[in-house]
Amino acid sequence: RSKATTFGTGELIKDALEKGCREFIIGIGGSATNDAGTGMLSALGYIFLDENGNELEPNGENLINIKSFKDDKVMKEVSEAKFLIACDVDNPFYGTNGAAHVYGKQKGATSDIIKILDDGMRNFSNVIEKIKKTDISNISGSGAAGGLGGAFTAFFNSELKPGIDIITEKIELENKINGSDYVITGEGRIDFQSAMGKTPSGVAKLAKKYGIPVIAIGGSVDDEIGNIYDCGITAAFSIIDSPMTLGEAMDTKNAQRLVEKTAEQIFRLIKQNKKN
């Protein structure tokens, strides 16, 4: 929400730096924050100021008031570190597809708060461009985790890379996919965001190179998913088989049963098609 902060993330990085860590892989996403990373930056020594030079509390609400920042108290270790940022979405910093508009509602923000946050993100982006000569406004993934992706890009020696790319390289997924008959992927909720750099689309793009059908399984499947087919997903199925609460659906034993049941039905159909 408007007062939520990434300060705790900064504290974790600070602790790791103090213990000698200089190479980081940080996964961003699924956050409850929309402060453009100012909380994290504050924990590492950055100070944000309003037009009168007064220090501001780092949160989403104050983004609109930031006119400058000071970095003379930033930990020297920050400049020695390299950050590989695992980012599964490609949203820009602000705007219609930016952090506030796409993820604000999910985090409990009303339409009025979303406007405040988006205007603040735009202002902070302009301040960054003016002082650091870096335009993060349309960098793919800069809007991830409420703008945390943009903060890493502008203030640190960092690289934003899809989390799926990091994982696929580590486990050599493309080699495993090549030669398969079918590929199964999925996530909790399959919706239009699934095609925006998230794991299902990353897997599907690899499979598409070899003409392999991709089946996505999710806890729920939204109505507006036409874009997922463009990235290579053949079909998507929800595992829910009867009315149930979210808690029941997420229960570990229940979820496992539902996934197995759905997978069995999918492959029964595939098996029958092969017979025909």
What are these regions (language model features)?
Residues 1-28, 32-276:
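N-terminal loops that bind phosphate or other acidic moieties
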